[in-house]
Regions:
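Short, mixed-charge low-complexity intrinsically disordered segments
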Residues: 33-61
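Conserved aromatic
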Residues: 20-25
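Short aromatic-glycine-(Arg/Gly/Cys) micro-motifs in beta-strand/loop hairpins
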Residues: 1-17, 44-48
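Solvent-exposed serine/threonine-rich low-complexity stretches and specific carbohydrate-binding patches
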Residues: 17-19, 59
Length: 61
């Protein structure tokens, strides 16, 4: 599985605006750090497949 992180305010998945992760733990770390840097903004971890991306979880620092 591939995971990516982006702010919840983006709405839909943006493969060019996200930050790609090596695995789910890495995605959680990215999301937490990004949320903390943005004052506690909601981040979405996306599970990215060959056909579509699915909102997998929400992270807030």
């Amino acid at each position: 599985m591939t995971f990516a992180v982006q702010p919840a305010t983006f709405g839909n998945f943006d493969e060019h605006g996200c930050e790609w992760a090596t695995d789910l733990d890495h995605a959680r770390d990215i999301a937490f750090d990004w949320s903390a840097d943005e004052g506690g903004a909601k981040m979405i971890v996306w599970r990215v497949g060959t056909v579509s991306a699915t909102r997998w979880l929400e992270v807030v620092a």
